[in-house]
């Protein structure tokens, strides 16, 4: 038996302005080359644009977008008897949120547009309304899981 202790799960800190953990998770994913202040600027500009577009609370739009994109099931490649199967596996809420944030950022980076704040705000508004690339990615993942339901016992 291992004598090594189990690692404690780190809790996400909240950001200085909105006091929200989701915002901080999003900032940490936007972050490139250690430029956190730039990541905060991008997100806060995106939030202002969301406020202007929808005229509702931008944090509720953000929550709704992430809730809409969060997957319940993902597929993992499992090698069984020389062949690789895509095995559907349920994931927890934290992992699901992390995936949702990653998908939202990938989708917004792919978008044509002026700057990242504009693209991110557009993607978040679309995701909150039930459209956009990130939602399509979630549906695609769920379809894959449904198609490979026969391999669920390989968990």
UniProtKB/Swiss-Prot annotation:
Organism listed in the record: Lactoris fernandeziana
Entry annotated with the keyword Ribonucleoprotein: yes
Stored NCBIfam families: rpsG_bact
GO molecular function: rRNA binding; structural constituent of ribosome
Domain of life: Eukaryota
Compartments, as annotated in UniProt: Plastid, Chloroplast
Pfam families: Ribosomal_S7
CC annotations in GO: chloroplast; small ribosomal subunit
Record-given protein name: Small ribosomal subunit protein uS7c
Annotated disulfide bonds: none
A biological process from GO: translation
InterPro entries: Ribosomal_uS7 (IPR000235), Ribosomal_uS7_bac/org-type (IPR005717), Ribosomal_uS7_CS (IPR020606), Ribosomal_uS7_dom (IPR023798), Ribosomal_uS7_dom_sf (IPR036823)
Quaternary structure and partners: Part of the 30S ribosomal subunit.
Biological function: One of the primary rRNA binding proteins, it binds directly to 16S rRNA where it nucleates assembly of the head domain of the 30S subunit.
């Amino acid at each position: 038996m291992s004598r090594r202790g189990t690692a404690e799960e780190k809790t996400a800190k909240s950001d200085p302005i909105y006091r929200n953990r989701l915002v901080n998770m999003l900032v940490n994913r936007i972050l490139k080359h250690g430029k956190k202040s730039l990541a905060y600027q991008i997100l806060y500009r995106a939030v202002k644009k969301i406020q202007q577009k929808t005229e509702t609370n931008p944090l509720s739009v953000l929550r709704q977008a992430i809730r809409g994109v969060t997957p319940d099931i993902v597929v993992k490649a499992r090698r069984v008897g020389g062949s690789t199967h895509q095995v559907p596996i349920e994931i927890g809420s934290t992992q699901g949120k992390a995936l949702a944030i990653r998908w939202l950022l990938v989708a917004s980076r792919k978008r044509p547009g002026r700057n990242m704040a504009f693209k991110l705000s557009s993607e978040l508004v679309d995701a909150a309304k039930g459209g956009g690339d990130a939602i399509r990615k979630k549906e695609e993942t769920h379809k894959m899981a449904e198609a490979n339901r026969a391999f669920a016992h390989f968990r």
